[in-house]
Amino acid sequence: MAAAAPAAAASPEAPAVSGSADPETGDEDSREVRVLQSLRGRIYEAKNLLPYLGPNKMRDCFCTINLDQEEVYRTQVVEKSLSPYFSEEFYFEIPRTFQYLSFYVYDKNVLQRDLRIGKVAIKKEDLCSHSGKETWFSLQPIDSNSEVQGKVHLELRLNELITENGTVCQQLVVHIKACHGLPLINGQSCDPYATVSLVGPSRNDQKKTKVKKKTSNPQFNEVFYFEVTRSSSYSRKSQFQVEEEDIEKLEIRIDLWNNENLVQDVFLGEIKVPVNVLRSDSFHQAWYLLQPRDNGNKSSKTDDLGSLLLTLCYTEDCVLPSEYYGPLKTLLLKSPDVQPVSASAAYILGEICQDQKDAVLPLVRLLLHHNKLVPFITAVAELDLKDTPDANAIFRGNSLATQCLTEMMKIVGGHYLKVTLKPVLDEICESSKSCEIDPVKLKEGDNVENNKENLYYYVDKVFNTIVGSSVSCPTVMCDIFYSLRQMAAKKFPNHPHVQYSAVSSFVFLRFFAVAILSPHAFHLRPHYPDTQTVRTLTLISKTIQIIGNWGCQSRKKSRFKKSVMCEFLKMFQEERYFTDVKKFLDEISSTETKESSGTSEPVHLKEGEMYKRAQGRTRIGKKNFKKRWFCLTSRELTYHRQQGKDAIYTIPVKNILAVEKLEEGSFNKKNMFQVIHTEKTLYIQANNCVEANEWIDVLCRVSRCNHNRLSSFHPSAYLNGNWLCCQETSESTPGCKPCTAGIPADIQIDIDEDRETERIYSIFTLSLLKLQKMEETCGSIAVYQGPQKEPGYSKFTIEDSVATFKTIQQIKSTIEKLDEPHEKYRKKRSSSAKYGSKENPIVGKIS
């Protein structure tokens, strides 16, 4: 089940949440339901930011994405602009619970701390309402009130005390147990404490907890006592009875603060609980959501801060155990063999989905996982060709076939792009050479002839890199290209060039040209490039696309209207370019076996800057943790003093025994994990929870098949002669906790087939009305034996109404059976998260 419109992606698993139904026994607790969250979207641009006061009004801006206050993504810096254009796409799994998704716009400051200009904060429950829409959000001011987050666990009790002279005194016991999810202060865990006050018309008794160091989840466990009424006001007969006028006016107020020592303490939030919650029961326990101050100042000129354009798609999938998805998977995996293919479940999915792109990714991943993708794409591509009368228009549309093939290339071609394009793209992006050849767009001091030479050098280098890369082309891509080529030649026997166009329209137009134009979207570069580099990449991409197209045609001519581009393209009209294109297309569309994604070479999997704890040292202090550049390939994990420097330390992948999270209490640091290997455990701190989750996932995948993997581990560190988790003194003591369950071993393509099937179930569920319409259309065709004229008929491709009708019936039956365990889980989840629980804390006052 999904909380939003289906997202077009699924990635490594996130933490699981227990509780589902066993398909045989119906036992809700005997299986595990995984609740997987993901977020994708784009940060487009900001507009009308406040200028600096003074002659230099421009700002150097960047934007961050934060889960609550934890930064998980940062854009590039756009210099000297009050309307910065970022255009950065993002996708990540969300490995923990959160209250707010926030976007902060900063002004970069070299000498001082970066200045926060404003933010957009969206409650988790409101994310679905923005799904898939381009939306302008007004930037809101940032102060201590706007940064409030977290919750408090509180227990109240009313006791009766009898004095020596027989009078009765009422005593209020306030037990502040813990807080969870307090905000970060300057990117670090805070030093929180709480003040506990009993407030009334004529009293304000205040007490204070101890300060807890470096934690966002403090465990206070402190009890405070307050006298509710004067003992003289009561006699023995007033047992557990408080005067109404007193109890209605009294309240417990808890304020959370960050201890700043030398400067003023920072407000973290407050809650107010009326004492009359004890009127009917002398005991009350609940979690409360922290709130801003009642008198929090809200700016009346929030629009003046500027605005931010975003697209968001938040998805929450509740993935049941594998047994439930068997019937739906079977129905989908039969699709390549169904005649005609338009009557298959996979094709019908693409027909009824509101946005076909939503259906393509889970479908492609599922079919790819079961080696069914090549025959399915071949079948739907053949259907496309039936409706293509012009050989020059082959595979130019945006059909199910072209979308499936395009998505497949993104999935399996990632490493192919890295070994082919990344080195030359790095050279282009890190160079300051101008390649502008349009005199109208030239900057002052630029020389057209020099720029033309620069552009020619880059285009020629990119071209030679591409046409020399056929040996690295993934086998599954070659197999599909071979099928496309054969079908095209059969369809248009009098047009020999069309067999090349069928392949070129994908590998040049939809693969290489797009990756050159947007390297950040293919993980070839960390950020969207600057304006000059964007222009250079655009010119290179267009030229490569044209040359690739020329190699498939009998006559070579430019489609560019601008004489500037036409003149430049003449430099590439040598016969060798056309010959090299055809040779390359021949090689990647042959039936000869290729290396699967170039796996004879080490596969580059992940790299980035993190902190590692010095190994084998006992000294205590910040210097024990050093910033290092980590690099993981399919063969080894290394770390370096800086990117590009020689490795300081190398761990062969075959020596990794386990990769697990490390408890925060070990070093009082968040987002830590441990790489347990044959020599010594390596403790690493990631920059945020998303990054930590990604590193753990990829390290687990690459080492999953190691023969000596551990079955248990220590969740805390070994310090001062004992394990902090189990207090064992021997460092060689076996682990006290079972290792995390294994992750799919394919380091190239990590596919969670249950999650993909759950996505497809969600799409079918959201599209039932359209499925019903398609079913009715099939019935009408069968009854009237002729073409339909009713509205909406033309939206469906129905070649065999009887076969299509039968498949729709099977889909509906399968979906109905899956609805039952989903509904059971929804009810259980709803009932378990009662108001006042940690999962569903109380907001504001209760009476």
From Swiss-Prot:
Chain intervals for the UniProt region annotation (Disordered): 1-31, 819-847
Q: Which residues form the Ras-GAP domain?
A: 371-588
Could you tell me which residues carry N-acetylalanine?
A: A2
The UniProt entry, under Pfam families, shows: BTK, C2, PH, RasGAP
Q: Tell me which residues make up the PH domain.
A: 603-704
Domain C2 intervals: 19-137, 148-288
Show the CDD domains listed in the entry.
C2A_RasA2_RasA3, C2B_RasA3, PH_GAP1m_mammal-like
Q: Where is the composition biased (Low complexity)?
A: 1-21
Does the keyword Lipid metabolism belong to this entry? no
The site feature described as Arginine finger is recorded at R396
Q: What is this protein called?
A: Ras GTPase-activating protein 2
Record organism:
Mus musculus (Mouse)
